[in-house]
Curated annotation (Swiss-Prot):
Membrane topology category: Single-pass membrane protein
Lineage: Eukaryota, Fungi, Dikarya, Ascomycota, Pezizomycotina
UniProt pathway: Protein modification; peptidyl-diphthamide biosynthesis
Matches recorded under InterPro entries: CBR-like, Cbr1-like_FAD-bd_dom, FAD-bd_FR_type, Flavoprot_Pyr_Nucl_cyt_Rdtase, FNR_nucleotide-bd, OxRdtase_FAD/NAD-bd, Riboflavin_synthase-like_b-brl
Catalytic activities: 2 Fe(III)-[cytochrome b5] + NADH = 2 Fe(II)-[cytochrome b5] + NAD(+) + H(+); 2 Fe(3+)-[Dph3] + NADH = 2 Fe(2+)-[Dph3] + NAD(+) + H(+)
Name under which the protein is recorded: NADH-cytochrome b5 reductase 1
Domain FAD-binding FR-type: 61-169
Role summary: NADH-dependent reductase for dph3 and cytochrome b5. Required for the first step of diphthamide biosynthesis, a post-translational modification of histidine which occurs in elongation factor 2. Dph1 and dph2 transfer a 3-amino-3-carboxypropyl (ACP) group from S-adenosyl-L-methionine (SAM) to a histidine residue, the reaction is assisted by a reduction system comprising dph3 and a NADH-dependent reductase, predominantly cbr1. By reducing dph3, also involved in the formation of the tRNA wobble base modification mcm5s 2U (5-methoxycarbonylmethyl-2-thiouridine), mediated by the elongator complex.
Keyword match Oxidoreductase: yes
The species this protein was found in: Neurospora crassa (strain ATCC 24698 / 74-OR23-1A / CBS 708.71 / DSM 1257 / FGSC 987)
Family statement: Belongs to the flavoprotein pyridine nucleotide cytochrome reductase family.
Length: 310
């Protein structure tokens, strides 16, 4: 649901002022009907309020089609795809930390078609009505990612959801330790943005994120991450590169147990580790976190787990 205030102008214009005029007019014309007018204003105001709420469009069991509105090329194999929702005030209705499923009929080498489904986490949120954004890296062997790369503005994709075991709520932990590799940054960014937006309402969650990539050019959404770090002292990002440029001052190589111990919070009941990236990286990090004293990660993570892999 959109994070908005009941003091916004649209509520004054659409609810408070009309309700006030109804009650005020009744007092002038027939004072003894004031109570009935107040009840009518309350009922009509409630109806109008619920009609003004953002319309959630996702259906967990049903694929729906959404039109590609805009495509922003980030690099030779990465793009941000913006899809249009049915109305300007529609939202996906996607809880923070969950993802959507994209389905497509993909042609196979033998000429047949096969239904392929893959999961993606939008980098936009329900506070941005009317559209949703997907950051997707295309791989030579990636069925859906190649299909997405071939999409033209005006064409559609099939989406259903929400999916996923993780749902973020403010102050669910004191401190998140995060490790992301490549496009695994998308659920982390979604959670971090929610934390920063929630500061005014009392969200005190701290975040340390290790973001691993091959080269500096592979660091996705670096400007967005750096802006969040500059804006919020409770957010820290530690970049790690396998092939760093000359003069690089960040981490080098694969994310190791020593890096996790040095850069992420220590094991505690109010600490949670979030992981998202290539399977070999996640497998190694599950072993590393267990060796450091965190609870052993399950093969399939659940919300209550101390180490959660998306």
């Amino acid at each position: 649901m959109s994070e908005e205030s009941l003091l916004e102008r649209k509520y004054f214009d659409g609810i408070y002022i009309p309700a006030g005029l109804l009650v005020f007019g009744t007092v002038i014309v027939k004072k003894e009907w004031t109570l009935y007018a107040a009840l009518a204003a309350l009922i009509l105001g409630a109806i109008k309020y619920f009609r003004m709420l953002p319309k959630k469009v996702l259906k967990p069991a049903v694929f729906q089609e959404f039109e590609l509105k805009e495509k922003t090329i980030i690099s030779h194999n990465v793009a941000i795809y913006r899809f249009k929702l049915p109305t300007p005030d529609s939202v996906l209705g996607l809880p923070i930390g969950q993802h959507i499923s994209i389905g497509a009929a993909i042609e196979q080498p033998d000429g047949s078609t096969k239904e392929i489904v893959r999961s993606y986490t939008p980098i936009s949120g329900d506070h941005q009505p009317g559209y949703f954004d997907l950051l997707i890296k295309s791989y030579p062997t990636g069925n859906i990612s190649k299909h997405m790369a071939s999409l033209q503005v005006g064409q559609t994709i099939r989406v259903k959801g929400p999916k996923g075991a993780f749902v973020y709520t403010p102050n669910m932990v004191r401190h998140f330790g995060m490790v992301a590799g490549g496009t695994g940054i998308t659920p982390m960014l979604q959670v971090i943005r929610a934390i920063v937006r929630g500061r005014a309402a009392g969200d005190r969650t701290e975040v340390d994120l290790i973001f691993a990539n091959v080269t500096a050019q592979d660091i996705l959404l670096k400007e967005d991450l750096d802006a969040l770090v500059a804006q919020d002292k409770g957010i820290r990002v530690h970049y790690v590169l396998d092939r760093p440029p000359e003069g690089w001052t960040g981490g080098v190589g694969f994310v190791t147990q020593e890096m996790v111990e040095k850069l992420l919070p220590k094991p505690a009941s109010d600490v949670k580790i979030l992981l998202c990236g290539p399977p070999p990286m996640i497998s190694g990090l599950k072993k590393a976190t267990e060796a450091l004293g965190f609870q052993k990660a399950r093969p399939v993570s659940k919300l209550e787990d101390q180490v959660f892999a998306f």
